[in-house]
Amino acid sequence: MNSIKLEKNISLSNFTTWGIGGPAEWIAQPKNIEELKYVINWTNKKKIPCSVIGAGSNLLINDKGIKGLSLCMRNFKGIEIDKNNGIIEVLSGEMLPTLARKAAASGLHGFEWAVGIPGTIGGAVVMNAGAQEHCISSYLESITTLSLTGEYQRIKGKDLNFGYRQSLLQNEKLIVVSARLKLASGHAKEIRQVTNENLNHRLKTQPYQAQTCGSVFRNPEPLKAAKLIEELGLKGFRFGGAEISKIHSNFIINANQASSNDVRELIKYVKKRVFDSYGILLETEVKQCGF
């Protein structure tokens, strides 16, 4: 008998890094593939929708909540590292910083940039997450997905149509189950040092301890969204309980019990100011659920 709990009417504010979100009609937190498959079969039998919320970063959930089942993947963890071949097999709920540190400890080079990104492997693949001119697609060999009808599929990285913060998965109803990465061998001590330097830099330049979703806006390459926002004097600007970070202007923090509407209105205001001043229409990285 499967031991996974399916809980009802649970506040999603406790499941997002923004600390924002209304109740989930149902929520499940699978720990392994068997539990994940059980949950998907359950949604099919009940004929209710399924929304993947990962570990809750890069996500804005409506204060009214989400209908159907919310699939939280933060307990869906596991990493296997083959040091000799530089191959890493990782379940999609594993956090990027954890993987970055374990890769460094194993003497594998290429993932140092990911140490301060508060997201899961699954979310990183879907969004093609990156930093410091790196992105996960450069190291991704393949993924395993599960459809909402319960079918598994192995997809090569080159077939995912990656672009800047984009992938084929954003338009497909597929759950990322696991990823296979290929990294290069290096000296563990040096890789750990670079990894720690990257983390320290993030701690100094980003509101790491505040409630945020991560970066809000995509960079309108070659420009930086944060620079455009900062030049308009918007650091510290607030709408309700939502505030543009005084540390890094591409972060919106939950400064005082912000509502989902506070965040949406602040995003709308920033986009208007940037467009009026520069003629540039900023796009958001944030996934919105329940609106």
UniProtKB/Swiss-Prot annotation:
It catalyses: UDP-N-acetyl-alpha-D-muramate + NADP(+) = UDP-N-acetyl-3-O-(1-carboxyvinyl)-alpha-D-glucosamine + NADPH + H(+). Disulfide bonds: none annotated. Pathway: Cell wall biogenesis; peptidoglycan biosynthesis. Residues 19-186 form the FAD-binding PCMH-type domain. Its main location: cytoplasm. The active site is at residues 165, 215, 285. Its cofactor is FAD. It is found in: Cytoplasm. Keywords: Cell cycle, Cell division, Cell shape, Cell wall biogenesis/degradation, Cytoplasm, FAD, Flavoprotein, NADP, Oxidoreductase, Peptidoglycan synthesis. Pfam families: FAD_binding_4, MurB_C. GO terms for cellular component: cytosol. HAMAP family: MurB (MF_00037). Belongs to the MurB family. PANTHER family: UDP-N-ACETYLENOLPYRUVOYLGLUCOSAMINE REDUCTASE. Cell wall formation. This is UDP-N-acetylenolpyruvoylglucosamine reductase. It comes from Prochlorococcus marinus (strain NATL2A).
